[in-house]
Structures are given as C-alpha cells and as structure tokens.
Amino acid sequence: MKYLAVLYFFVFFITPISLRAQNLLGLPLVNNYNKTVYGGGSRTWDIKQDSRGILYFGNSEGLITFDGRYWKSYALPNHTIIRSLWIDQHDRIYVGGQGDFGYFEPAEQGGLRYTSLKALIPEEYRNFADIWNTLSFGQSVFFRATNVIFELKGQKIAVHPAAAEWYFMGKVGESLFAQDKKNGLLVYRNNHWSPVLATLPYREMKIASMLPLGKERIVVSTLNNQNYLLKDRVLLQLNKEHWDDSYTPSAARIDDSTFVVGNAKEGCHIRDRDGKTIQRIGIREGLVNKNISAVFVDQQKNIWVASDNGISVISYGSAVRYLRPNLENEVTGLSSLIFDHKLYLSSSNGVYVAPISKGLKDQSRSLSSFSLFPKSDGGEAWLLEELNGRLLLGHNKGLFQIQDQALLPLSNRTGTWNVLPLNSVYPVNQALVGTYQGLELLNYQNGIFQSGGQLRGFVDSYRFLELDEKKTIWASHPYRGIYRIRLAADRHAYDAVLLTKKNGLPSDYQNFVFKIKDQIVFATEKGLYTYDYTKNAFVKSADYKEFDGLTIRYLKEDKEGNIWYCTDKYVGVAQFDTKNKSYQLIKFPEIEGMNTSGFDHINTYDKNNIYIGAEKGIIHINYEKYIQEARKPLVLLSQVTAKSAQDSILFAGYFTKNATGTYEQLRADQLELASKFNSFQFAFSSPSFGIHEHMEFSYQLVGYDENWSTWENIAEKSYTNLPSGKYRFQVRVRNNLNQISETVSYDFTILPPWYLSIWAKLVYILLGALSIYLFFKVQKQVWKKQQLQYEKKMAQLRYIHQLEIEKSEKEIVKLNNEKLEQEVLVKTKELASASMQLLENSGTLVKVRDELAKIEGSEEEASELKRINNLLKDVEKNSANWDQFALHFDELNDGFLNKLKSNHEGLSRNDLKVCAYLKLNFTTKQIAQLQNITVRGVEIHRYRLRKKLPVGKDQSLSDFLNEI
C-alpha cells in the first residue's frame, strides 16, 4: 500500500507543471443556446440521449427535447423542476422531479405522455423533496432523494432509507455506488448496500461525481472542491496541479482515454486517463457561462454543457478544429507552414508559432500553445514559404527570412504577397517575388538570399504567380485580367501581355492563377479555364467540369490528388475518384462563412492535417478522420400539423418501436381525417449535431407529388387544399458527403366530405334509385295525363279539323252552289232567253202566218202561200231549239225531264214540253203560243197530263211537277 501511495505521489506531484498548463492546440467549435431558443428555464440539471439521437434536458421548467432542429418542452403535472434523467434500453425516459418521479413514453399522435410512479411508493415514504439522481442498474431503476433511494423493479418499488442522509448515487462501470452521511461510500450488491469506505477523509465530505479512470481506478470529486483517486478501497487526494479545487458537479466519459468534467470556476476540463487536464473550455473558448451544472457526451462525441445561462454544445468529436493563437485579441489566419516541428501561422498581426508533437498524426491534438514570434507584429504577415530549406516570411513590411528567433530582412519593399521559384532544381537559385507595387527578383547564392532588384515596368500588385512548362509566368490581376510574362535570359528584359475577356476569359474580374497537376489553371467566375497555345486563347477546362458555374477564388492540390478550393461562400474539396477518374465535390458546412474571403489560404500538409485560413485564426481538418467517421445520417419526422383556423398537431415526433427495435408508424396510428383538414405542414430534422443546420432534405407526398423534391436545406413543407384520398408523406436527408438516410414515412387519409362519404353515396344511390323510380312513375302519370290531354287535344283537333273540313266542304258546297247558282242563273237566263226567243219567234211566226192569210191572190200565189205556211209550221215544229232548251232545263232542274220520262214512259214529246213549261210557271197562253195551239188545246192537254200523271184531285198539276 505504501508503494502505491508513493507511485501515485510521483505520478501526480512530479509531472512537469509546464506540460500540465498546456492545452490541445486545436479548439473544438462551441455553439450556445439560450433559454429564448430552447423555450425553458435558465438552469438545466441533467442531459441524456435516446437511441435515435434525440437529446433530453432536465430543466427548471420541465423536460426539454432537441432533435437537431426543433426544441420542445413537456412539463410535469406539478410543474416542478426535473433534477435528473435516465433513458433505458427501450428509450423510456425516467425523470426525477420535486415530490414526484416517473417516466415519459410515446403516446397517441406521437407525443410524450408522463406517467407518475408515486402511487407505487409505500404510503409512509411518499413525502420527499428532490430526486437528485436517476439511473438504471441491472433490471431496476433507482431514484435518489435526500432521505431515501427508491428502486423500481417491474411494477413494484422497494425503499432504501438513508441511515442519516443520502449524499450521492452514481454508476461506474458495472457497479452502483451511493454515499450515506453516516455509513460512508456504499456499493449495491445482491440487493443490499455494502460498505466500500466506511470512513471518509473528513466528516462533511460530499461526493459530487465518480468517474472511471483506467482499469479499477475511479476519480472522486466532491462538492467541497476536493478530488480523490479510489483504488482497491483506498482513497488518495490528488495533486491540485492536476485537479482544480473547484465545485465539480458533473462528469462524463468521452472515450477510453479522455473524459470531461464540469467545473464551477473555469467551465469544462478535458482530462486524459492519467487525470491531466489537456484542454480547458471556458468563456474565452466560447461558453456563455463557466458555472457548469451538467455535462453529457452524445453518440457523436459532442459534449453538451448545462450552465446558468443556457445550454452549450462542444463539437469535441469533430474532425474540424480551430487554431486561435490569440483568444484575447483575435487575428485572421493568412498562411500556415510546418517547419522544424513547429507550426507557423501568419496572421493579420504578425506570426505565431507553436511546437507540435512528434509522431502525432493529428497535429491539432498536440499539447502546445501559440506564442507571437518576436518583432513580427505591426502588420499583416501574408506568406510563409519554405525555399531551399529556409523559412521565408512575406510581410506588410517586406520580405524576411525567419531564422531561430530573428527576422532577417531580404527586401524592404512594402508588401510581399508571394515567392515563385523560377526553376525546379534544388537549390533554387532565383525566384520572383510578387509585391504591392510590382515584381522583384530574389537570388540565392552560397546559402544566402539577396534581392535581385525590381523588374521595371511592373507597377501592379501581384498576389498570384505561377510558372508553366514553357517558362511562361502567369500573373493574375483582380480587375484587369491575366498577364502572360516571358523573361529574357538575363531575367531583366521581358515580354508582358495583358489577356482579357477578348482572349476567352468569361470576365476581366475575379481571375486567379494556380498550378494543379503540373498544369496552369485559371479560376474564374464561371469555373476553371486553361490556356490553349495553339488558339492563343483561354478555353474552359474539360478536366474539371465539376467546377463549372462556381466562382473559384483559391485552389490547392493535396498529395492524394484531391483539389481543395474556396468559393465566395464556402470551402470544399474535389475528392478524386481513381476508379471513375472524376471528382466528387464535398463542402464543409461546419466552417461555412468562416474563411477569409478574398485572402484565402489552404495548406494541404497531409490527409490528417489540412490548414485553412479563417477570420479567427486557422481551421484544421483531419480529412482522413472526417471521411472515416462519417455516419449515414438519420432523418426524423418532428411534427405534422393540420392547418386550419385553429391548428391541430396530428403527430408530435414519436413513432412506436416495433419488435425489431425500429421506430415506425403503426397501422392503428394512421389517421383518417375529416375533409376540413386538407392543409398540412410537415416538419423534419436530423440529429447530426454540428452540421444539423446544413443538412439537405428531400420529400414526397405519395398520392399528390409525382416525384421526390430537389435537395434543399429546408426542414419543413406545407401542402394546402389537398383532395380526399390516401397519402404517404416520406422524407430523407443527405449530408455533405452525399450519404442518404433511410426514408421515414407518415400515412394518413383525408376522408371525403360527408356528402361524398360511402354512406352518403349509398344514400345517394338509394335516393337516385328512388328518384328514378319516382321520376318514371311521375313521368308515367304525366305521360298518361299528357296522353289524355293529347287524345283530348287530338279529339279537339279532329273535331276542329272536321269542322274545318265541314266548313271547307260547306264553303266548297257554298262556292259550288254559288257557282251552280251562277250557272243556273246563267242557264236560267239562257233558258229564259231561249223561251223568250221561242215565244218571240212563235209570235212572229203567227203574225207572219196571219199576214199571209190576209193575202189573196191567184191560185199560183195561193199555192205558194200554202207552201210558205207549211214551212212556217215546220219551223214551229223544229226540235233544234227544243233540244237545247231541254238540255239546259234538265241541268237546272236536276234531270226533271229525264225523271219524268223514266217514271212515266207514256209521256210524249209534247207532254214533256208542256210539263217543262208548267215547271217554268208559263201561263196557258204562253204555252199555247209555244205549242202553236189554242188555249183550249192547252187546257185539254193539261187534262190529259193529269190522267197520265197520277195527280190527285186536290193537287194542282204545277205542284205535282214541282215536287219531282
């Protein structure tokens, strides 16, 4: 035991103080979040992380979660402080509050639901204050209050009362320790507490944390600012030079060789396995407060720090580090160089130098510190260049050689930008120096550099110079173009031509010249160009198409053939793929906006040490580690919100863990939403802390979007006025190395409006069928009614038509009658005329006959008169006039004469004439004239007719004839 004590004394007391005071050369990036950002109280007491990468903070206002983009808070039912946290293998979140403890787990709609365990505590132990420690051990979860430790196993809680007062509880490896005021340090074994150290160094000693330090060695820190080493049940106080006498409430292991402790005086200390502080991170290094209440190391080796004024994250595990030579007065890093096992850094105010550890792959992990090189301040130090085994410094004051601790002036010309060797043979005997006001020669002879004088005619500022295989010097000017310079053998005479846009450059502005793969390359606003001597013009390079469209300001090739570059916005590397003979462009989002825009610098020392000029010092990238430790990113669906007059959270970020341990949406959780919920906002994230704000997302709403969206750094998507149907929102994330995550999906259904639902459609079908039935029924009735109306109408029409016909017929009859009447009238007139003609002729003939009878003469004359008289009688008896008369008479009297002849065949021609005359109401006298008989003869003839015709005694002959 004495031997061990001596050994520990030697280790912790004899170690050189200067070494202990040094830090790792490279600082990790520190980001801070105040309570306005995370939406909680100013004090955080504990930090944990689940299997998906989501962080949990026990805060003075409850439980706070952070998924890389979004902060959320959950209060306890009694709205008290959460002092302690623990997350088990099933991602159940156990919390210890004030007067209560329990757990959070996913509930409906993806939110966290709190379940109190207080009801399981025996009644007599339910009165307790704060739960200061919560952790799992074996199959149990332990909760430490001041007076009692509760052990949850299954659905039962066992009680471990304090003998006096429980000061501490913590797990170290496979052991659970607790400190009791009376019984000292105890270990939990076989369901009871066994003593480890019954007697502590002093009575009021209170343990704050216990950390494993190598095999079977535990560092014990107390609230009384004391630090001890526990080994083999022996507690030894550590040297104050190793451990600060400060309040150390929290500690966490980083890896097998380092751990972090939270310190009340200086913030965080990173310590190695021997207990030595290798890095201090306090307010100067970026923390907002040095009073640390909790520290936690996440899955990516980031250190999360809870302090009085907020939450900080230290990107300790990152391959990117920051070399800041002067934390009190920040300087811009302009150039860097490794020379003689020292890192030289030229800045906006002099040169800083730091020793680096030999044999250490990652030089930023050297235990060292920067110091200002003597007399190098007072202006910008633009250039560090090794030439012929000498270290040259291009300074605002001129060109110098750094030798030992002195600056040897080589040129007093103001402002040296660069030094270009004019041959590749070692040692270089001559170089060209670009200055603020032209070009100058630098000669090397007998191990000494001397100025060769200025080249006359060059008065411009030349920051970039390169030499090609034809010994042509190319110099770029920021706003004029590119100079092509050929020196004569004496190096003083030269031929210089200014080449501009007219010679193929995309612009006269922002052109820079570099040498890549032994070829002169011109970086422009539109990509990379080369010079074609056959065309005497600049042409876009076919070898570097990946750079097309980029505004390149700086290029540097590394030993692996990768091309590091700076644009006007970021720094990246074109990683060469030897298999495909192509480049993959990789950006570094961690340092976006930090490089020295306009005065860029990249030093590709090797794959473990890439130095980049920054606004604050130099950025160091261990590129090999950066690539090797890159992990496939994880995407999280943080929230789904239905947008309406009052937004509704449909999903709050937590899927259910299935049997395979994968988080996914269960079928029972797939919502069917009313049609009014047709506008949504999806929020997503990735817990890739350090670059989480630069991750790119792609999404698709299956059922609406035809394709995946383009990659962009936007962590939310909204949809409005979606139609009813089934949808699946899916999202994935891509990091800067083009690694793509698995897809996370969320299924939901928008139901049709009630008037388009299945039941509504069934009702519509029934109503439609009923409507059709009623329609046809009504139509049938209407048709019948219309048919009746039609028939009635048709009857009316037929009646009207009949009337029309009858009317027409009557009209026709009338017209015919009128026509007949006209014809009768005409014929009557003709008949009357004929009758009058007959009467007149008859009378005339009678007069002629009478006159002839009066004539007396000779016998011969008497014979002639007799003959004439006979002729007259023949005329009177001529039937020609009668035939015409009979024809007209029958037409006017409906065939009167024909009827008489047919009905009374015994009637003679004269009988018919007499009947016709009687029908015409001729008088007896008129008839006698027409018949050329006497009146008496007419009367006799009438008498005979009465006999021939069956005329009654009481009926006149005229009436009888009129009835025929």
Predicted regions and their residues:
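Conserved beta-propeller blade signature
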Residues: 54-57, 92-94, 140-143, 175-178, ...
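Short loop/turn segments that connect beta-strands within beta-propeller blades
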Residues: 67-70, 106-109, 152-156, 188-192, ...
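Cytosolic signal-transmission helices at domain junctions
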Residues: 321-325, 760, 773-846
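Basic, Lys/Arg-enriched C-terminal extension of HTH/homeodomain DNA-binding domains
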Residues: 943, 947-964
